Amino acid sequence: MGSTRFFLADLPTRTSESDLQILFQDYGHVEHVDLKRKEQDGATKVIAFVTVQTDDAQYCVNELKWQKLHGEKLRVSLAKESFLDRLKREREENQRREQGEPDESEVRAPSSQLLVQSGQNKRRVFGEDEEIGDDEVAPELLITKKRAANSMHNGRIVIQQEHDVKPLHVIEQHRKAAKQKPDANVSQAEQKRKESLNKMRQGHQQKKSAIQQALSVISVEGSQAKRIKFSDAEEEEASKPVQKAKIQKRDLFENDDDEEEEQIVLPQHKGKKGERLVEMQSKQSIDPRFRITSNFVNEEEEAELEDQPEPEESERKWHMNILEQVVGHAITSANDKDGKSPKNKKMLRFDPAKEGHQKLMRQKQPKEEEEKKEETSSTKAKTADAGNSQASAVSKTAFYIVTDTLRDSLNTRGEGFSLLDMFGSAPEKEVAKRQDQLEKLGHEKILVGKTSANKLGLATLNPFSYDSSDSEDETEVKPKQEQEQEQELEVSKENKAQPAKKSGQKRNKNKLESFFIPRNDPRLKEGAKFFKSTKAVVDHAEYDQVKNRLKLLITKKIAKAKKSLPSKDIKLQRNKKGKN
């Protein structure tokens, strides 16, 4: 007896090793029970490995599947061999082979009773009304009380033999109907039906094969298919012996010339009809079966194409050609430009966005450039006269000096490049000229108009602008303004008296003011006065005058106020009336 290992899955949580030993002890000696618990997702799973000494392990598995443990069915299967058991088994097999002993599988094959025993007498079907005595039933088919509850399956009692896997005894409610033998007429009709179906299939396949053979003859390159030519009976009889003679005279070694002679070349139509055919064929498929032939071209179309007259030249052109032959050269008329009709002429529209149309724009040159051009033209004329007077001409070729030593050449390169040396004077001379100009501007006087004086705050301030005595002060302010105007006129005369330098360029009409503020600028003096914290000097004479004016104003205002008040007599009358 060999030991086999069973695997039990999804066991109830309250199962123990003793329960499994009681369950398996009926089938053989229980060597080892290994119970394992595993927690997964909050639920405990219980599995077990049981090693039992049995001769038929498959029988145990099939019978245990029908039994229950703690109200749940068992899931039993043969466990895989462990690594150590497999090594042990392989070693034992190798030792037996070395000793010359047969394998266990060869020894156990004849001992299996499943193939030897036949199941004809071990399976019996009972009806509902039949009664069976205890003596008639074999002891192998009896069910013990212990396993009676677990032997029910789908409302039937299943009795299993020890060495048989399949159910042996099944009690059913109804007997199975015996198979009736087919009638002779029915079998003949069935045979006829099958024969007709086979004939239909064969005919369909023959049609398919015929179509395939026809297509295989026609090549894709457009080779001509075999064509059937209909002719009279007399012509057929005359042609038959000729074909036989040709067949008989075949040589053993055929030449390529014979194949070329067999090819038939169809005549292609020429002229306009042929062009029409080619145009129609180009629109169709390449397959030669659907090729368009000359029959598709209608006779009416041919007549139309032939009747179309060729375009005659106009009378004017004919006359022009005669004139050209007489004159001897081509004549181009104003109307004919590149053979285009005057209807197709279009007016050229000016579009300033396009680059080509910008050339049509007239570009206005400023006056200064025109004057410069005139000056340059005059200077060029003078230089030309001077050049003619010179006897010897100077060559314009450039010369380069190349030093022998590398040191000298590097020193010359380090000098650098300056535009002042080439086109202008040295910077020191320019600075000296600039300083002289600034000194001259510093001594000149700057004219400031009335509007600019108001902007700068240099206008005379009137402290009594809010007073009604402006009319009295106008007489005093006017002589001051007249004095300022006289000073401006004198300064302008002095500036005019200075001699003006002659120059080729025109003078600007607007007078320029220097960028730098001169020392004698009145704005600087007023600024200094504003920031100085000196005590105000008061003129007593002016103070007395202002005081007298204020007194007069106040007295006038008091007099006006008194006049507007009611008289004393009127007040007294009102008081009396109020008392009454």
Curated annotation (Swiss-Prot):
Modified residues (Phosphoserine): S231, S468
Biased composition (Basic and acidic residues): 89-100, 348-358, 365-377
Composition bias, Acidic residues: 254-263, 298-313
Domain of life: Eukaryota
CDD domains linked: RRM_SF (cd00590)
Disulfide feature: none
Annotated GO CC locations: nuclear speck
Region (Disordered): 89-131, 173-211, 254-316, 333-395, 463-520
Phosphothreonine modifications at: T475
GO-annotated molecular function: mRNA binding; RNA binding
Comp. bias regions, Polar residues: 110-120, 386-395
SMART domains: RRM (SM00360)
GO terms, biological process: mRNA splicing, via spliceosome
Keywords, sorted A to Z: Phosphoprotein, RNA-binding
RRM domain location: 4-81
UniProt KW Phosphoprotein keyword: yes
Protein name: Probable RNA-binding protein CG14230
